[in-house]
């Protein structure tokens, strides 16, 4: 645990707004790892993806193919009871796979919940890992895998700067298979873990391409169990992943190229390949999102949203996100008493997708002037008629489209409905400043006053 002096020092860094994004930056060495040459390249990488209704029944065979002898299954108690998940467990039994179950995952993980999972993994000699659940489960499994591979590491060693030491992952991790049961985070495709660091009431993370699952089994049958609100909140995470990666600055404008290509950040800026996935996801959202939320038995709509989640994950996992996500971290980190429908009531939480979309109408109205064509195209992909639109109206048009989706899907009316007041704005701004590595991927730069205005304009949405 951190000393009080260390926490005080970090609070000063965070308040200064000069640090790198603690959720996604990889290195603490700053300019030592970059050249004087502007970025000229981008990379595209992802997990192997297998998609199809019922594909969970192949899990046992996949573990056989890995010659797995002692498997750690990370899930949570509610997910483990689902009939669709039992199919996955039955496949393990049928194939003679020996496994142990860790089901104490916390929705919206914290440093303590991740440390608990890591210690569990260290107590056993697992040769492979399987995550069956939503993004919280998959992220928890990534951490368990990492710290079981490096048994001497302290928790903050791999946590991103300035909170942690941002140690590079040099140990060999065990194979990890992700079976996402929600259509939202896309964590099955990324090497990023996000969690609440409670001593600072801040979101931070661990980021390395080596954390990325070896295989993602995308089985849309799991999504039929999602309650309405869970489907809506998770869907808006997909929604914003696609919009933010599509409107991020081009990869050539991100900054200097790294001295070593291995140090190229996971989030590189918009690029031609990520754009393909973003467009694909936005089109699916237009055609399926509303039905997927309100019709729990609409397998086609829920299947398509599950596919959109993965495709948007591939896109943003390489291009990045920007302001909606950067602003979301202090929103969820400063939760007061809000407990949403469809979630366990054992602790207040603001689900990730809800915290992200809360500021989206204000964000895209703010960023549009820097790349109006992109914003208009996004609005059109989501169903707006922009044939006679003026470039100067791009922000208002996309903002209205986002607002209409939120209204139709019965999303809470702004930060006020989550328990925030205007007195909280300065704290929310301070919580956003450390997310610079994300927020500077936005097509328009921001001052503290701009950030305050974005929160102000998000107090109510309708």
Curated annotation (Swiss-Prot):
Pfam families: ADH_Fe_C, Fe-ADH. GO terms for biological process: glutamate catabolic process via 2-hydroxyglutarate. Its main location: mitochondrion. It is an enzyme of class 1 (oxidoreductase). Transmembrane segments: none annotated. It catalyses: (S)-3-hydroxybutanoate + 2-oxoglutarate = (R)-2-hydroxyglutarate + acetoacetate; 4-hydroxybutanoate + 2-oxoglutarate = (R)-2-hydroxyglutarate + succinate semialdehyde. The keyword Ion transport does not apply. Its EC number is 1.1.99.24. Keywords: Mitochondrion, Oxidoreductase, Transit peptide. One of its GO terms (molecular function) is metal ion binding. It is found in: Mitochondrion. GO terms for cellular component: mitochondrion. Belongs to the iron-containing alcohol dehydrogenase family. Hydroxyacid-oxoacid transhydrogenase subfamily. Catalyzes the cofactor-independent reversible oxidation of gamma-hydroxybutyrate (GHB) to succinic semialdehyde (SSA) coupled to reduction of 2-ketoglutarate (2-KG) to D-2-hydroxyglutarate (D-2-HG). L-3-hydroxybutyrate (L-3-OHB) is also a substrate for HOT when using 2-KG as hydrogen acceptor, resulting in the formation of D-2-HG. This is Probable hydroxyacid-oxoacid transhydrogenase, mitochondrial. It comes from Aedes aegypti.
